[in-house]
């Protein structure tokens, strides 16, 4: 090794550079490790290790010899006598190490160099070896991964082959199926073609059949017309033959009478007695005047005219023939009737009624009602029957004339023809009552009765005239020997009957009557009418001709009846006028009899084919001169025509047409009322006005007394017409059968009840009439009254023990008929009397079927819920009425539906076809009726009819939807929050129960579906509440699994209560949810969220709307760091959060087996550190050092720490709290000079709350020792808390639904949110963070739909009670921050200067208008009314603008937060302190300025005047305002006024008058003088604030005229940065400011809101 070491010595013969270069070259070649293999590297490493060991041995040996060798090498070659020895020593001692060169070779240095080189090589080799090993390992790992990938690849390939084979098989199967399906499609297409071909053939056949059917129908119609024509001809021929027979019989009788008279006269002559000359052959001695009527082949229509009560006075002396003119139409100009004549006549009306089909079945009751209005001459028809209309006195000499009728005159023969051609037809003396519609066929019985009861044609009537049949051409004179006796007998009976009969009104026209012509005037006619025994009838097959319009007539349409042609010549069939000996004859008024009454009887046509008769011709026998024409006509009344079974006859079917004393022509037809006249039956032809009946007619005609045998028929007629007087007279007669029934079985009581004549029913019942007498169809009077809806008659009948459950032949009961009629009062009376609801008709229908069939909801409700009240129990009746009313109100709960009294069997009863009431309601689309039926729990909607159809199968679309949701049970879903103690930590505004939606539970709903519905409803609610906008649940797409933004979801639910039964999601009961809810009477589903009691914060998150994740983070901070303080603006829910976190921690510790206690302390201004120490020691949070830690968990909450100094209160506890061990104790000094050491253990948690936005001063020293949770108003969770909370409030108010964004409630809530945000933003700009507000005060915002005024009123209370005082205090404290040192804090706060007060009020006004009133949802007028409720809302802001800042405070001062804004380029004459939306256009500014000139008028001026007097500043006070803080505060207010980022408040400037009043205020004489007199010199001291303000104004403002309108400038200030400054002239202008004038440029383009010259 020594040799090796010696060999390594350097060669000093070469230079060091050459040696180094020679050594480096072989080293690069020998030691290139990268090229060596692993074995070579190992060999090299072993050689080098051996070398190192050898060298270490050499080094140790050399060290032992080092000293000796060193001395020998250094000094051994020199001796002491050598002079160079000192030089060598000095050389080595004086030079540096780098400059010295070794004298001899040093083996130690060489060895050290070799050792260093070897170490480097060893490190390099080890590094390379480690790299090689790592590469080797990596390579092996990659090989293993490659093998694994290859194996996986093989597996995947095998799987792929299998799948390929499977897919190939599936594809083959699909191909086969496609082929099969294509074949089926082709077959179906062929079948479809065949079916379509058959369908076309069937359609063709159907079309052919329809054509044949129509042809057959037409053929049958023609045949029927021919048959009708033939029948008409037969009737005509029969009538002619009968008339001829009658004439022959009458002629024979006359001849016999003449023979008898002649015999008597011969006898008298023989006896020599005197005879009266007038009795012998009167008809031969008098002129015989006949009015012949052409009959031809037409059928005659008869008119019955009754005798009048007053007998006519006959004139015996002959009268000269006078011209008689009979106009054919009523004249409006000059009627031919004397004013002294009066009479009654038939109404000129067309009465058309449908014919009766005698073959039709009337098993059911069909009630048809037509509303009617009576004619002007007719009286009203009431339930008691028609009352007598007011008629003029029949004895008066002058009848009433219409307004348009001229006085009647008697025309001369020369004017008669002209009058006839110009005047419309009128019913005059010889004009009968016109009949314009005739019955198609007259009953043979009526014909027989007519000819049976008709008097002799030649018998003289009571006026002395004989009636002659129309076709008679040669009637011989008759005898008049018995004339006086017959007249006396006839008049006696007539007057007796008429005495008890009041004048009746004419029956109004029937429903469906053909319209008659309108007559323009109402002309009074004579009381004497003309009888018409025979008038030709209309051919049934052909329609009647329409009378042509004649020239010269009035424009009113002519009446449908033709003119009456009266002829004197018996050989003529028709004539144009009435002539006597070819002269026109006029009857004088003096010859007319008085007191005659006319009653007509009319036959009616079918309503389906109303026809008009042709012009008939009438033959009249004219009496001799001096005798009036007879008014007594032959009666046409016979037996009643047979009525069909059933109750569909009109109520006035037995009523005759009664004519009042005075009848005027009506211009139109008024339909008859339903209670007085109905369609479906013929009219009985009665003469009830005079008391005549058909049975009495022949006897009265013959002049004999009236026996009582015909009284029952008259009784029925009086009862049917409601004639109480006649009825009472007849009932007082003895021997009268009041229970007499006609051939249809109708009794008098039946007729009265059917027509609703209550008084008649009462009279008959008092007379012991049979109350249960039935007609031939089994209908009783009660049935008739129920069918017609006469509830008063029903009440009387029930009171007289009528059978309420009587069933007719078809099974119809009165209740059934009442339900068919649809009268609630009738149904209620019958049900109250105990009528049976279950009686069934022949068809199987019940009253429920009838009520449902009419679709009357009220009737069905009465049937199902009305109970017969207990006598004397009024409470029961009130309860029943309330139950019926409650049905109209939709109740969600099953308890809201009253109990039905109808059993399930009756509801589900089926008729003969198998249809239930539900089938009927569903098929007719009566959804309301079906809904009421569905409320019955026993309804079986699946009941099938005989065709196997359910109600759903036959229902309409609406009813199908109702049946599908039949068993849906709506129940509200609520979220309940437990453990919310009222009045604790600001939780008063939290709602414990919130309705989130309504669940719709159907009968088939399973528990899984119910669980999913509840979970989905919760998720939808959480996401809807936490969403950003007002979106409905339909507009929002929710994720079923994701939680909401507040972190709540289905997992937050602790339990669910179904009513009072607990239930958890996924739990199944034996009953389905629908049955379970019904059985347990569950009215709601309550969801209980997990809360602190379970160690969770879900309920806390939902209550406070703080995201769950943030609450969990707060809890983690408290558990981890033990010392946490929550701080933020006042009202940020610090105390609530701390308390809920403490509760959660407590229950978690209790669940873990520890005991835990919560200790709360309210910190106030007098709370000392000693009290805090006592609290810590008493709660075992601070324990002595000698004591071992306790296992009890203690949570201490220090509230309201902002009221004390943190550094003074917690300064000594900071280190012990941060380092909780015995090593950092807290030393407590006791009063006796002793001290004791305590420490905080690990089981103690300390939480504090501070209602302060930020810390200041010495309190910052405490900050680093605690964990701080800052609740900023502009950051989460406070930023979105109010929005989420109010949104949940709205959802609860709308019962789980979100209103539309345009709803007023949404706008009101958005306004409340904007107020909170804008208010804090403005307060932050003012630099008063102590006035910031948290969302707590806004949680009580009322949500009242439709009443935004309540929210504005609440906002005014909040502003006056909380916001305004806090802002005032904050601004005062900021404005007087530097004055407190000189004046004292107490003095500054208690006595603020007027300038400070002005700043406060200006700030309040700006905040109110910018943050509160801006965006209010109320209209301008309503908002103006509420503005006065806000404190500081009427402050004149010109006070702020008139303030001038001092130049001492520069703009770059950091005390206030500045906002770079630009001035608003707006001006105008505004007087309202309310901000509107900005309108930057000049036109908009002008319009708004003009529109707001007169805002609040005198009230505003008076209020501002009082404020200005209080707030006007003197010059000294202005100078005192010039402190730096106040200047910056005013600048910030000015910036807020001009900020574009805020609401536009440039419109709050005062009017010109207000400014002048302010300028001229007596409190500021110098200022007002400077403004009002700009040329007056002012001292520098007086105007220094103004001049300093003017130094920054630009002297070259450009003038511009704005639309030619000069406006008052807005005096709100603008920032200095936005005004061009003339900095070069600042000092000069400041020094010479006393000579400058105040300029106000109204037309400047740049708005400079400062005081300048006008």
UniProtKB/Swiss-Prot annotation:
Biased composition annotated in UniProt, kind: Basic and acidic residues: 1644-1654
A Pfam family annotated for this UniProt entry: AAA_lid_NAV1
GO cellular component, one term: cell cortex
Predominant localisation class: cytoplasm
UniProt modified residues of type Asymmetric dimethylarginine: 499
Listed SMART domains: ANK (SM00248)
Residues with PTM Phosphoserine: 1523
Extent of the ANK repeats: 710-740, 744-773, 777-806, 810-839, 843-872, 913-943
Subunit details: Interacts with CTTN/cortactin SH3 domain. Interacts with STRN, STRN4/zinedin and MOB4/phocein; this interactions mediate the association with the STRIPAK core complex and may regulate dendritic spine distribution of the STRIPAK complex in hippocampal neurons. Activation of glutamate receptors weakens the interaction with STRN and STRN4.
Protein name per the record: Cortactin-binding protein 2
Species whose genome carries this gene: Atelerix albiventris (Middle-African hedgehog)
